[in-house]
């Protein structure tokens, strides 16, 4: 049901001058007891970042927001420079100056759609939106015998610290689908996903439902890959 709320916002192009598009049914998300809203996506689509931006707009109507994006914490100074630049050209230059990461290798988190999301968030901030944009991938050490499940715990700790730093804000996170899930997948070596480590009464996890199409993915090679048709 909740996943359909995201899917409902994917139908038309966005122009910042037209303002934010309403997301039908999003009022169900803004309960007083919900501190975290996690949006799980398949990286590399056009639609998910656009819908997430609309959801951020809706959240800002309710109060201050922390926007947590799936970039490494080392990327935070670049995010800050992008958001604070005087002009869009300077913002783009700050992003291009980062020596590695998704906007150099262009995986699904460094797509034109994600750049459009960052530009929309920047525009909201320039309109005095009560919002902070933060990176959400911790620098977890790679230690033999300690699998991805430990990185998931680190990610949950980082989210909680971001929330505690601004206790009157709601945290909205856009992450890969698995990190937003609240139970362990059957047979998965991942262990508990990051969102499952946070008190469930304070969290809502959404999953973007796609009706087919493709996503830009980088595995052995980068390119378009089909994504499953999900009945929202």
Residue locations for each model-derived region?
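Sec-dependent signal peptide recognition
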Residues: 1-8
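Compositional signal for N-terminal targeting/processing segments
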Residues: 9-232
């Amino acid at each position: 049901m909740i996943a359909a709320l995201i899917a409902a916002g994917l139908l038309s192009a966005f122009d910042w001058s037209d303002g934010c598009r309403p997301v039908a049914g999003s009022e169900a998300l803004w309960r007083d007891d919900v501190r975290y809203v996690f949006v799980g996506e398949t990286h590399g689509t056009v639609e998910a970042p656009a819908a997430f931006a609309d959801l951020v707009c809706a959240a800002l109507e309710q109060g201050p927001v922390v926007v947590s994006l799936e970039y490494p914490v080392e990327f935070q100074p670049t995010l800050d420079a992008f958001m604070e630049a005087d002009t869009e050209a300077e913002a783009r230059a700050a992003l291009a100056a980062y020596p590695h990461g998704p906007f150099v290798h262009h995986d699904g988190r460094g797509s034109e759609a994600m750049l459009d999301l960052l530009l929309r968030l920047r525009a909201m901030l320039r309109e005095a939106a009560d919002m902070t944009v933060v990176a959400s991938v911790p620098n977890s050490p790679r230690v033999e015998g300690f699998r991805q499940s430990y990185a998931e715990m680190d990610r949950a700790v980082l989210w909680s610290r971001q929330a505690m730093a601004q206790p009157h804000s709601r945290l909205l996170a856009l992450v890969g689908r698995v990190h937003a899930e609240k139970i362990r997948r059957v047979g998965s070596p991942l262990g508990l996903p990051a969102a499952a480590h946070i008190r469930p009464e304070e969290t809502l996890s959404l999953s973007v439902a796609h009706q087919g199409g493709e996503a830009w993915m980088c595995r052995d090679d980068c390119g378009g890959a089909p994504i499953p048709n999900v009945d929202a």
